[in-house]
Amino acid sequence: MLPVRESLQKQVKILIGLGNLGFGGYRGLYTRFTNPNGFLEPASSDLLLINERRNLSVIGAVSRTFSVPSVSGPAFQVCGYHIDLLLSDPCKSMASLGSKSLFVDRHSASLVSKRFTGGMVSGDGPNRGRISMRLRGKDHNEKSTICAYFAYRGAKRWIYLNQQRRGMGFRGLHSSLSNRLSAGNAPDVSLDNSVTDEQVRDSSDSVAAKLCTKPLKLVSGSCYLPHPDKEATGGEDAHFICAEEQALGVADGVGGWAELGIDAGYYSRELMSNSVNAIQDEPKGSIDPARVLEKAHTCTKSQGSSTACIIALTNQGLHAINLGDSGFMVVREGHTVFRSPVQQHDFNFTYQLESGRNGDLPSSGQVFTVAVAPGDVIIAGTDGLFDNLYNNEITAIVVHAVRANIDPQVTAQKIAALARQRAQDKNRQTPFSTAAQDAGFRYYGGKLDDITVVVSYVAASKEEGKH
């Protein structure tokens, strides 16, 4: 669907293993290649190493291979993906790409209701369209950060919730939050109301002094579980972790583009790849996520649209930008002290970036500064996570993991596994079902979707990777 640019000079072929649905694990195929753009085509099982040769190992059955065209750019670590294995070194850089299906926003600080009818809204150009029910949503030196980048071809299947409830009108929700918030005045907006404004302010103030004397680092791990129906082809989610630069990002391609014959997974993958490239140009220790997203959006030309959340630990604290219904939360001493709010134009119509100026712009994203200290845990994810787990459920897993000295990779897997379990439970109340009921639907249970989870432990920089 997307033409391969003439400038692509080399290819690196990645072995990708697919297993039974369960936990998502990663084992790196360690090599260096340049600027993977995530455009996937069928390939043979040969493995071509670019720039230098290293020992490669694949653990688990390998059943499918892809090739990733590349152009000159920063070095990456290529990761294999195997769903039924719990494999990975949490100290290694990780990234993965995934999928998307249904709709709905669930947490928002202040909501304005209005009524509209879902359906197709025409856009600019003969091949453009906006699906209001689901369209949500350079030269580098040799010492570039080693990042992991793992690509999947996006699935082309999408399900409208209102197809099960045709003829029903529904209320739209619109977030009226300001575009720039700080941890001092941004409340936790989860449905379980576990944190108040005063708690956030007090916690942030008490941590701020610690930042002045303690250089910090992020120790991160990730897990991705595709929608069961999209396991073979991947999906529309994407994420990256840059360990050296202390940055990470998640994106959720809007599956509704499949109705127009467009795979939005290309867009989210290219957006995250361009975000990694932009991070390489940022001053060390002073990454500006908003500037990174602006550059990445400008460079992303694939058709489709996506949500985006980029987070960076800098000398001044945790900086982030979030656009749409992906997001992140910060857990401290067993409590959720911060949760990024969801952005959406109307019910089931999230903010989304799109190539050109047809969608929302990066400037519409909400920018956050959060004071953090050693012992804090950051959880970032797509709506497949936050639609199915309340804040206190995520926090409970984090508390257990910290006490048991479990690394962030396994913690991410445990969170993703519980989110998948909740998604398949037709009787349990979830953030998704609560939001649907508030919008006038008789809906119970979770929302089956792609699930991307990134867990980062905040540690003193002198520590060796354990929380």
Curated annotation (Swiss-Prot):
The broad enzyme category this protein falls into is: hydrolase
Keyword Cytoplasm: yes or no? no
Q: Tell me the cofactor note.
A: Binds 2 magnesium or manganese ions per subunit.
UniProt xrefs under SUPFAM superfamilies: PP2C-like (SSF81606)
What region holds the PPM-type phosphatase domain? Answer: 222-458
UniProt KW Hydrolase keyword: yes
Kindly state which keywords UniProt assigns to this record, in alphabetical order.
Hydrolase, Magnesium, Manganese, Metal-binding, Protein phosphatase
* Pfam families with a match to the protein in the record: PP2C_2
A GO molecular function for this record? metal ion binding
* Xref: Gene3D superfamilies: PPM-type phosphatase domain
Its Enzyme Commission number(s) read: 3.1.3.16
InterPro entries on file:
PPM-type-like_dom_sf, PPM-type_phosphatase-like_dom, PPTC7
Known catalytic reactions: O-phospho-L-seryl-[protein] + H2O = L-seryl-[protein] + phosphate; O-phospho-L-threonyl-[protein] + H2O = L-threonyl-[protein] + phosphate
Q: Where on this chain does Mn(2+) 1 bind?
A: 252-253
Q: Which cofactor does it need?
A: Mg(2+); Mn(2+)
Recorded protein name is Probable protein phosphatase 2C 55
